[in-house]
């Protein structure tokens, strides 16, 4: 009994783990050792625990052992007959990366040099490792090996994302060609490759020449685009449905509710639901990054997104717009939501800037059905009614404006929302397009925001508030001057001028707040309101119906703005928002890394 009790039942692989981490264990480590090591069933939980308990000094002393493991893995990746060893070795290496990086997450260089070797040989050895890994993914017929290799690539990308070593990956043609081939052929696990191309394309794109991004810009294969869009749509729908699982959408109503009346509605999310929303969007939003980056660098993909559709289920554009409505509704809940809301607006600007797509965005023959978020008041009217893509994009802007207002001042968000509205209006007028849309609700949002800014400009005047006031006045002046070229029904135009009259009480205080060279829009709005006031001042009771009747009679006589009377559409450059882009991409890389480590 005593002899039996003394038998060591420690699994052999655990014994080897302890040997590797023991600085006094000096037995030779060669390919024979690693060959047996990676045939044994990994005990990754045990390895993680041992790595966490090992002092940093001992890790440093044992660095040559870890580097030997890395070199063996690099070589074995070239052998198609070693599927078991390949799967075990990549899982083990991923655990090493995860646990060592957690020890000092602000400095991945310690982990990199510990595993990958000294500075003299790291470039050559790392390039060989990446090349062999990519070749395995392209050539292997073992489904499990391909899947785990792709997961390792994604983890490696997210692990190296904040270091200078990431350029060794996005600058490596083998990586690009491998991910392209996997997606094109829809190999098992290709969804992981779709995640990876979004992160790699976004990395350092404003600071250096990202050759991975250049490769994406040259793709013309529609099968590749279809694979990306179908995979992305599934993930975007899944994420959207997760929002809905936290809180079902409210019953739909006929119009936007008043901005200030329903902030505390019992149908708004409770504190527990707000907490859950604050953790979204999750790693599935990386698919949005992929769509975003491809739209930025590849016009053919952008065209495919806008014009392409699926006969069964939600089309990719429908899925994308639906998710963005939820993200913009909850964009004040977390920094990640805020960043993705900004990226969604940048994408809207990129789409509207492509004039060849405007017809598709506005033609009623190409209406789509998008599930728009109604989890929080206020929300758009007729959210289930088919509409044009541009109509839904304007709805998302209205959602974001109203949910951002009063609660916090995010000047960047406002500038993007209103500059998009301005850009959309000018595009419609210049192309002579009258779009079917619930214009009355857009007027309501614009004038509600004007009331909001009028309070800010008098109580908390800042440079940002002044710029916002100038922008909203430019937008309103342009719409007032060109309203007949936008709307289809005259009652929509009448309502616009009625709301202008109702808000005119604020105009007199604006003159002293705006520089003289920027007063053109305000002066034009004052001219129009003075004209309409002169026509309605003698009404017996000045009821809404009476005022609207007079406005309807005067539509043809309302003063027209002089050419260049007010500011044009603000110039747009994606690089203006590089900081938000970098924070969003690095945040998603970090989230993917942590998810991968937790799953491992």
From Swiss-Prot:
It is a multi-pass membrane protein. Its main location: membrane. Pfam families: ARMH3_C. One of its GO terms (cellular component) is nucleus. It comes from the Eukaryota. Keywords: Membrane, Transmembrane, Transmembrane helix. It is found in: Membrane. The chain crosses the membrane at residues 409-429, 437-457. One of its GO terms (biological process) is Golgi to plasma membrane transport. Belongs to the UPF0588 family. This is UPF0588 membrane protein C20F10.02c. It comes from Schizosaccharomyces pombe (strain 972 / ATCC 24843).
